[in-house]
């Protein structure tokens, strides 16, 4: 449930593509044209989502695994993730180690 402008909107988890920290809020990027702002922490929302479906790729980003279109090596051991909407995020070294074993190699071979 997302609260916006005095209304409560139900955003199905199946529509959520990624979540990004934005100060004291989280931007929920779904199939809507613009992200919804939720007053919560990214960690709190991550606890409520299926970890097999949503991956923590950076301290500021959580991404639906199926929304990742491309995985490419980047500078200093980081990895660049290109999403299906054309946006790009960095998979930091810190969070790369938390991914399921073999996931990164499997994605790179797709």
What are these regions (language model features)?
Residues 1-90, 107-110:
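Conserved binding/recognition cores within well-folded domains
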Residues 94-110:
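C-terminal output/interaction extensions
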């Amino acid at each position: 449930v997302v609260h916006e402008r005095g209304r409560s909107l139900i955003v199905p988890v199946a529509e959520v593509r990624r979540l990004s920290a934005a100060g004291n809020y989280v931007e929920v990027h779904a199939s809507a044209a613009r992200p919804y702002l939720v007053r919560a922490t990214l960690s709190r929302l991550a606890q409520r989502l299926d970890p097999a479906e949503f991956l923590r790729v950076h301290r500021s980003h959580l991404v639906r695994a199926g929304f990742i279109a491309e995985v490419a090596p980047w500078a200093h051991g980081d990895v660049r993730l290109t999403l299906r909407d054309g946006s790009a995020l960095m998979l930091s070294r810190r969070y790369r180690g938390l991914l399921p074993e073999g996931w990164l190699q499997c994605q790179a071979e797709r």
